[in-house]
Amino acid sequence: MKEANTRRYIHLCLVVVLVSTIITTEAEDDRLFCIRHHKYCGHRPNRCCSGLFCRCNTFGTNCRCQSKGALGKLISGK
């Protein structure tokens, strides 16, 4: 009985660590794992760092994280 409780406790601890790691990773995702300015973003267009967005050429290629232009800033209010 004591051995079974110990296994359950260890299992519960592992689950708590895993869940907290996932939550922390999602929270830090924007800062640590974002795509920086002028870097390629075609494979993950929503991963540009804060204040940037993925902009591609007319043919949908050569996508790069760039800041919004003056008109884009005016429209979004940021």
UniProtKB/Swiss-Prot annotation:
InterPro entries: Spidertoxin. Disulfide bonds join C34-C49, C41-C54, C48-C65, C56-C63. Residues 1-27 form the signal peptide. Keywords: Amidation, Disulfide bond, Ion channel impairing toxin, Knottin, Neurotoxin, Potassium channel impairing toxin, Secreted, Signal, Toxin, Voltage-gated potassium channel impairing toxin, Voltage-gated sodium channel impairing toxin. Gene3D superfamilies: 4.10.40.10. It holds the Pfam family Toxin_9. It is found in: Secreted. GO terms for cellular component: extracellular region. GO terms for molecular function: ion channel inhibitor activity; toxin activity. The keyword Isomerase does not apply. The keyword Glycosyltransferase does not apply. Expressed by the venom gland. The modification Serine amide is found at S76. Residues 28-31 form a propeptide. SUPFAM superfamilies: omega toxin-like. Belongs to the xibalbin-13 family. The transcriptomic profile of the venom glands of S.tulumensis shows that the injected cocktail of toxins is dominated by enzymes (mostly proteases S1 and chitiniases) and that it includes this probable paralytic neurotoxin. The presence of a 'disulfide through disulfide knot' structurally defines this protein as a knottin. Probable neurotoxin. Strongly inhibits voltage-gated potassium channels (Kv1.1/KCNA1, Kv1.2/KCNA2, Kv1.3/KCNA3, and Kv1.6/KCNA6) and mildly inhibits sodium channels (Nav1.2/SCN2A, Nav1.4/SCN4A, Nav1.5/SCN5A, Nav1.6/SCN8A, and BgNav). Induces activation of protein kinase A type II (PKA-II) and MAP kinase Erk1/2 in primary nociceptive and non-nociceptive sensory neurons. Does not show cytotoxic activity. Does not have an impact on Ca2+, cAMP, and NO signaling in the cell types analyzed. Does not interfere with the adhesion of leukocytes to endothelial cells. This is Xibalbin-13 1.
